[in-house]
A protein has these predicted regions:
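Solvent-exposed, non-transmembrane regions of integral membrane proteins
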Residues: 1-704
Length: 704
């Protein structure tokens, strides 16, 4: 515990000295001070990683002298969850934030030392300032190295809802996204301070922005999957305040990635780009603040704490400094060119940004409306999912339509007839698919438009690849597949973007179809009973009970039939974790602690069958009370036998179970679309190959 505190204090001192050295290095252009700053960045990184390693070792060794370990782990917690439990707590998540940011800062040291020497002092100074902020919080407000009360030998265990494999990765992905947004912000501040506001800083942050964007997207998708497979309500996005807070920086980062292309190519939107970078960083801080402040109710929040005030101060300082710097450098942020034509790729990018920022505003307003309404009227009123869906759906449809037409437009200006000729095949395909959807029973106009648009995007992207490959084949003599591979290899950013767009619209189409085609019911059944939902027959075959050291599971074995044919077997269950409340009795605490749902899902490309079970344990109340009275003092081995006997009674007596059965189309396409987005981002992040041989009629070097 003392060693961990010492590491944090040393890290804070190193960060503060590094900030001072960075400022002085900028003022004097002293390379020795800059070298000191670089070394201090690496020192902060090393100290942060050592602190994380120390905490991980404490979890693995069940060292309950650490309050964090005692409160969030136990001897029976599986190793995987011990390793990931570190960031399930407020203090541990701050340490994770610091580790991710410091590692990224070390990468900046490695890259900026050669390519961006003039920006480096301010960049490192900003990064170290943010590191110092998180170190200050851990030293003064929420230390991960607090000691447990004397004599603590038993841990409380990990919060049951977090015992889901993907949920352990969800915070890491989000924090890489949040911390990744700090790097573009640091470069933007450096560009504003130094007055070097060309495209060089954009080139420097391009990969960091893409990494942050990709991991924010991954975090959002992992959280959605957890909600769908674990929470027991049947949905994948509930417009929860903390979910929305993670979505906000992703939207502004998406806008920046697109608008930065215009500045690189045409020298336009300079004010807009630095504003988007600042907004993305501020919204990342807002997301981190919201989960810790307790000001809005959320299943994801840590609860009320004193950390809200420091975060509000930092957010206010960042916003004020950003506005002042942009206003100060406004003369240097004038665009080099004007928009040449409305029918151009620049115009599509601009409209894309307007819609993305509009979406961010709608989500921000809806998320913080309880606070706004309380401030104005004195009454806290929340806006539910229907409100969000009403106002976000038109903007989402607009994005799909822009993605459908964007690739077919040229930079600066496009002839109307040429554009129409280019869009003929994609639009015809989209209309045909829309007609098929209507014939299949899809009646929601927005769903038809999104699905139609998704196919137009797919067809437009495929057409762009085919045209580029055909041109390459004609000049090189290579076969078309080889030429296509060469084109993609040399233009990974472009075609990675196309693949990401395809994944995005596929995901949106899945969301639209899932929202328009859900049907289900709640039904109470006993073994032998059946229920029919949307063509499926779900038959309750028998109850299931399982006793493990860390939980007791009560569930059901269900047979799923369609058109007289057995499709699969599902085993939805409810898992009960022991309570530490001794007032519930020696045995009662095992059956009356926190419970989570294990969902039975039969997934397919067409539709999902989703089943949750809620067993009635009232029939076990009598044997539990009797065991509490008669066997409260028996040894642990005897307790285990009695608990197993009580659980077996559930199987023998087979009480009624309430099932929630939902059939929803399109859900699998959400995860497929997310996978395509990830593949597109990975392709765009890979550096293009140069000077490679193309297979064909003769070996030929691809010219630069």
């Amino acid at each position: 515990v003392l060693l961990g505190r010492a590491l944090l204090i040393l890290g804070l001192l190193a960060a503060l000295v590094g900030v001072a050295a960075a400022v002085r290095a900028h003022q004097t252009d002293d390379t020795r001070l800059l070298q000191v700053t670089r070394r201090l960045v690496l020192a902060v990184t090393s100290l942060a990683l050592l602190a994380m390693l120390l905490l991980e070792v404490a979890y693995v060794r069940d060292d309950f002298s650490y309050a964090l370990v005692a409160g969030n782990s136990s001897a029976t917690t599986p190793l995987y969850y011990k390793l990931t439990a570190v960031w399930s707590t407020q203090a541990g998540s701050l340490l994770l934030w610091l580790c991710v940011l410091s590692v990224m800062s070390a990468f900046v040291v490695r890259g900026a030392a050669v390519a961006h020497r003039h920006l480096e002092p301010i960049v490192l100074g900003v990064l170290l300032t943010v590191c110092a902020f998180f170190l200050f919080l851990m030293v003064t407000y929420a230390s991960p190295f607090e000691a447990s009360p004397q004599g603590t030998t038993v841990g409380a265990g990990l919060q049951p809802l977090l015992r889901y494999p993907l949920m352990a990765l969800h915070p890491i992905a989000l924090y890489i996204g949040y911390a990744g947004a700090t790097v573009p912000f640091a470069f933007a501040v450096a560009a504003l301070v130094t007055g070097r506001l060309g495209s060089s800083w954009l080139v420097a942050v391009r990969r960091y922005a893409m990494v942050a964007w990709a991991f924010l997207a991954a975090g959002l998708v992992l959280g959605s999957r957890w909600s769908y497979a674990e929470l027991g309500w049947g949905g994948f996005w509930g417009w929860d305040p903390v979910e929305n807070a993670a979505l906000l920086p992703w939207l502004t980062a998406t806008a920046f990635i697109h608008s930065s292309v215009i500045q690189e190519r045409r020298g336009m939107l300079k004010v807009w780009n630095v504003s988007l970078v600042a907004a993305t960083f501020v919204l990342s801080l807002v997301g981190t603040f919201l989960v810790r402040s307790g000001i809005l109710d959320s299943i994801h929040a840590f609860g009320a704490s004193t950390l809200g005030v420091p975060f509000l101060v930092l957010i206010a300082v960042v916003m004020g400094a950003s506005v002042w710097l942009i206003a100060w450098r406004r003369p240097l942020l004038r665009s080099d060119h004007r928009l040449d034509g409305l029918l151009s790729r620049e115009m599509v990018f601009l409209l894309n940004n307007v819609l993305l920022v509009g979406l961010a505003f709608v989500v921000f307003w809806g998320t913080f409306f309880p606070l706004i309404s309380e401030a104005v009227t004195g009454t806290k009123s929340a806006l539910g999912p229907p409100w969000f869906e009403i106002y976000t759906a038109p903007l989402g449809i607009g994005l799909v339509l822009l993605l459908a037409v964007g690739p077919s437009l040229a930079w600066r200006a496009t002839a109307w007839r040429l554009w129409m000729r280019t869009l003929r095949v994609p639009v015809a395909l989209g209309l045909a698919v829309g007609a098929v959807g209507i014939a299949a029973g899809v009646r929601t106009p927005s769903t038809v438009v999104v699905v139609l648009g998704a196919f137009v995007v797919l067809a437009t992207s495929a057409q762009e690849l085919w045209r580029a490959a055909r041109a390459r084949s004609a000049t090189s003599g290579a076969r078309l597949p080889s030429a296509a591979a060469a084109v993609v290899s040399r233009n990974r950013r472009r075609f990675g973007g196309y693949l990401t767009h395809v994944g995005f619209v596929v995901m949106l189409a899945g969301v639209a179809v899932a929202g328009a085609s859900s049907s289900g019911k709640d039904v109470t059944m006993r073994p032998g009973d059946s229920v029919s939902v949307a063509g499926y027959r779900v038959h309750y075959e028998r109850p299931v009970a399982e006793v493990r050291s860390e939980k007791i599971t009560f569930g059901a074995r269900l047979g799923v039939w369609e058109n007289g044919r057995r499709l699969t077997t599902l085993s939805p269950a409810r898992e009960y974790y022991p309570s530490l409340d001794s007032s519930k009795g020696t045995f009662g605490r095992f059956f009356d602690g926190e419970a989570t749902s294990e969902i039975g899902i039969r997934a397919s490309l067409g539709r999902d069958l989703w089943v949750a079970a809620s067993p009635d344990l009232q029939t076990l109340r009598s044997p539990i009370d009797e065991a509490n009275r008669r066997f409260a003092t028996v040894p642990p081995t005897a307790q285990a036998l009695i608990i197993a006997a009580i659980a077996e009674r559930y199987v023998v007596r087979a009480p009624a179970v309430t099932f929630r059965v939902i059939v929803r189309s399109g859900v699998s396409w959400i995860w497929i679309g997310a996978g395509l987005m990830g593949a597109g981002a990975a392709l765009a992040l890979r550096r293009p190959r140069r000077g490679r041989f193309l297979p064909g009629r003769r070996r030929q070097v691809v010219s630069r």
